[in-house]
């Protein structure tokens, strides 16, 4: 298949590899993005194990807690400027309070629910759109529960560009729970621990690392041992409890949590717009459109 400039650009953003290396990888793999990433990693060109999802949409995340229930949500806007608007800030708080109190199963159900004044949530958002002048979207939310013996860890980074909600079980130390949430915001682990990683993902990583070691010219008899060592680093990159704790590099997150007498069973991390591609207009066309709009 034809390799387009957009495909090369996407692969560069996901791997940090050079343009010519990306083009070759896509050519060798017939345009398969995932196989091209593996190709670059096997050659030692792309070092990142995690794919970097493009973050393009604007908006905020928000966290609301009430007793033993907590909620995290993401509300999208078209521009960062609107996300700082007082009307937008008020809307996200109203939505959070409603969602936590009424506990809809999903966004579709939430939009049909009645909010104050007899309006549906969808109508309430549409009224805000009319006032603010931009499309606003309730993208996602999740409700988390705990017991009296647990603590919520809630953290909003950069005013809500990233939001993390977690539960420290068996401990009521809210400061410790928040420290873990801050770590999750900064490091972005994919899983809580190694047990959560699928066998397929581990085997895929083992194959990539094996080919990488062979391409480096390592003797076959030591490749297996090298691969197991590199797999350990792979787990440290993606598993929260295996990671070095950002607030104390002398201990792992697991050790920090255990020192507080608690356990960590899961977490929710939202980054605004992750996985959403924003339409890319040609800059000259954008200027012309603005000029025409002012006529």
UniProtKB/Swiss-Prot annotation:
Keyword set includes Cytoplasm: yes
Region (Involved in Mg(2+) ion dislocation from EF-Tu) location: 79-82
Classification via PROSITE patterns: EF_TS_1, EF_TS_2
GO molecular function: translation elongation factor activity
SUPFAM superfamilies, A to Z: Elongation factor Ts (EF-Ts), dimerisation domain (SSF54713), UBA-like (SSF46934)
Gene3D superfamilies in UniProt: 1.10.286.20, DNA helicase RuvA subunit, C-terminal domain (1.10.8.10), Elongation factor Ts, dimerisation domain (3.30.479.20)
GO CC terms: cytoplasm
Coiled coil residues, start to end: none
Chief subcellular location: cytoplasm
Subcellular location: Cytoplasm
Pfam families xref list: EF_TS (PF00889)
Record's keyword terms, sorted: Cytoplasm, Elongation factor, Protein biosynthesis
InterPro entries in the cross-refs: EF-Ts_dimer_sf, Transl_elong_EFTs/EF1B, Transl_elong_EFTs/EF1B_dimer, Transl_elong_Ts_CS, UBA-like_sf
Assigned protein family: Belongs to the EF-Ts family.
Function: Associates with the EF-Tu.GDP complex and induces the exchange of GDP to GTP. It remains bound to the aminoacyl-tRNA.EF-Tu.GTP complex up to the GTP hydrolysis stage on the ribosome.
Protein name (record): Elongation factor Ts
Species of provenance: Bacillus mycoides (strain KBAB4) (Bacillus weihenstephanensis)
